[in-house]
Amino acid sequence: MTAPSSGVPGGGDGRQPLTGRQLLLLAFAAAVVTANAYYIHPIIALVAKDFGVSPSEIGLVPALNQIALAAGIFLLLPLGDRFSNRQLATLFAAGQLMGLVVMAFATSFWVFVAASTFLGFSTITPYLLPAYASKRVEPHQLGKATATLTTGVIAGILVARVGAGWVGEHLGWRWVYYSAAAVMLLVTLLLPRIMEGRDKSEASPPPGNYPSLVLSVFPIVRQHPEVLLSGAIQGLGFGIFLAVWLGLGLHLTSPEMGYGADTVGYLAAISLLNLATTPALGAWADRTGPRRARVIISLMQFTAVILLGFLGHSLWLLIMPLVLLNLVGPLIDITGRMTFLTLPAGVRTRLMTAYIVLMFIGGGLASWAATWVYEHEGWHGTAMLAAGLSALLVALSFIALRFDPARRNKA
């Protein structure tokens, strides 16, 4: 098993490093397959009204989607260390396509929930791509490559939320999923052309059958316990993101505020800033070190979350803390991944499994909590929930400094 620090181009598997064009194509694929989970954000009130359900009931849609994603990643993502990422990514993309089609035509709320849950279970492709790319870039370019893929994810989230808001308001929420299914069909056909199969010179897959492969996550995590801390931090960060934006989807379309779903979508255009800033901030994290960078951005995030509660009465004032949240949010994920993607290539996918499972458990719980709290306490309750999550994230970020190699060397 060859460590990425061996100096062999592409992480030591004998392949040439990814070209800029190939990395951009991977980022595009990540954008499309990631977008599917975020269409619900601006149209959540429209879907709830159409099916005649309460905020806490509609909150089950994103919550179960995220929990199913965590289950799918735990059960399916470890296969990336054994089978071709190309084959797996294409198969799971086809699963997403099936889920989108059922959601588009569902006439029962619970059928819609079930299809959304299956969609989440199938959303594995964007989490295969970072480990795939990390084997094909030079170690000193890992932050930049991870940031490029994260930028693709951000672009997908942006298009999903802005586009879904406009389409849902003017054409109806079902057209959001008709369109998503059409684009997903295209990506399912294109993925085999974007990715390469497993190379003969690549490290041998881990021994054992499927159950032993899945369970092998646990001893690997015990060997690298920091991944649990990074995963918990990212779970909190992702939970804050979902709590804020699902709460906004209900708050801004409420009688008190009186805006439409398209306004919620337009507000999500703030994420455009990330397309320009995330690669540069990823390079900054390379220079600063992921753990120290994470402490800084966690404090900035806490400041932004506190402002949300005070400024919730005004759409225009909300823009200020939302801009700050969008600037720093992706860096929590990037710095978290950087703490373990420099480890040997043969264990990265399973470490990514633990990391992403924790991320989506946090996101799923926060999704339901945010809609439940909104139903009972309104926007200020949602903001207080986000503030509590952010305070815990700051504390864990400081604790994670004990894993910083620079500190260990001084000790």
Language-model regions, residue ranges each:
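Helix-to-loop junctions at the C-terminal end of transmembrane segments
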Residues: 73-84, 277-290, 374
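Helix-loop-helix hairpin linking two adjacent transmembrane segments in secondary transporters
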Residues: 147-195
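A late C-terminal transmembrane helix in Major Facilitator Superfamily
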Residues: 342-379, 386
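Cytoplasmic helix-loop-helix junction between adjacent transmembrane helices
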Residues: 116-152
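Juxtamembrane intracellular "pre-TM" segments in multi-pass secondary transporters
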Residues: 8-17, 196-231
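C-terminal transmembrane helical hairpin of 12-TM major facilitator-type secondary transporters
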Residues: 291-336
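Conserved MFS/SLC helix-loop-helix module at the cytosolic interface between two early adjacent transmembrane helices
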Residues: 71-109
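Intracellular juxtamembrane helix-capping segments at the cytosolic ends
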Residues: 125-137, 331-344
